[in-house]
Design a protein with these regions (language model features):
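N-terminal amphipathic/basic-hydrophobic helices that include classical n-h-c signal peptides
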Residues: 1-36
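Positively charged, small/polar-rich N-terminal and surface patches that mediate targeting and assembly
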Residues: 10, 29-212, 218-227, 231-256
């Protein structure tokens, strides 16, 4: 929790609705929700577009379990924002494509990223480790980040996470790679933070960011989505899955 700015409203003011953002993912719920989920990591971007890098540790010798890595990536995305929510880059980023890029690094490269970007938010969930950074120009990522791979990121199944008051639910029928699932999980958790009341988020932060990850088959996923605690993420379908596929949402049981 060190370094997080508490008592600060984190509702970002967006200049245009999600429908007008080319290449963005949609976020759906019973009411209109104005936050885009993000463009694909492989989509060509404009020179001005900002993207949030999330670096996932994929240790060659002892890789983390998949759910641990997914949870760490989602929390790293959110904690990077909560550390400095008044950074104007967040406003510019949220008013555009709202994109995230999950890139993998081995232990040596991961350490280099942490040293090179002191503004990172480092998260450990069980065996999983990930670092979230503030948004930066997508077309001009620092070389250290640009050379990190995106496609083919896969962690072994590993042990499941224990139940938690907040759970990211993923659509298992889509058979997403770890990298794809991590990006969708980050979209869902970030959307929950932005839509929730500040007091709800602060209570979750004060409790130590409890989070679990659950995968459900399509029928159960759709049923649970009707009672989600936040927006249901719908993918633009540029990689791995069909356009319009619903990928992730947050389920809350005890978060105030």
């Amino acid at each position: 929790m060190s370094g997080l700015v508490m008592g600060t409203p984190w509702m970002l003011q967006l200049e245009r609705p999600v429908e007008s953002r080319p290449g963005s993912q949609l976020v759906t719920r019973s009411k209109h929700y104005p936050y885009a989920g993000g463009v694909s990591e492989y989509t060509q971007r404009s020179d001005e577009e900002l993207i949030q890098p999330i670096i996932l540790l994929v240790d060659r010798e002892d890789p983390a379990g998949e759910h641990h890595g997914i949870a760490a990536a989602a929390l790293a995305s959110v904690q990077a924002f909560l550390r400095d929510p008044e950074n104007p880059d967040w406003q510019d980023w949220s008013s555009a494509a709202f994109g995230k890029t999950v890139r993998r690094a081995d232990a040596k490269m991961f350490a280099k990223v942490l040293a090179a970007f002191p503004e990172h938010a480092l998260v450990e969930v069980g065996e999983g480790r990930a670092a979230g950074l503030p948004p930066m120009p997508a077309a001009a990522l620092p070389k250290l980040l640009a050379k990190l791979q995106v496609s083919g990121t896969q962690l072994p199944r590993g042990e499941p996470l224990p139940p938690a008051p907040l759970t990211i639910v993923l659509n298992a029928s889509l058979e997403m790679s770890t990298g794809k699932a991590a990006a969708q999980a980050a979209h869902a958790l970030f959307a929950w933070v932005l839509e929730s009341k500040p007091g709800t988020v602060e209570a979750w932060v004060a409790d130590g960011f409890p989070l679990s990850v659950l995968e459900l088959p399509a029928k159960e996923f759709r049923k649970g989505a009707r009672k989600s605690a936040g927006p249901v993420i719908q993918d633009a379908g540029r990689t791995e899955i069909e356009p319009g596929s619903t990928t992730a949402y947050v389920s809350a049981t005890k978060v105030r």
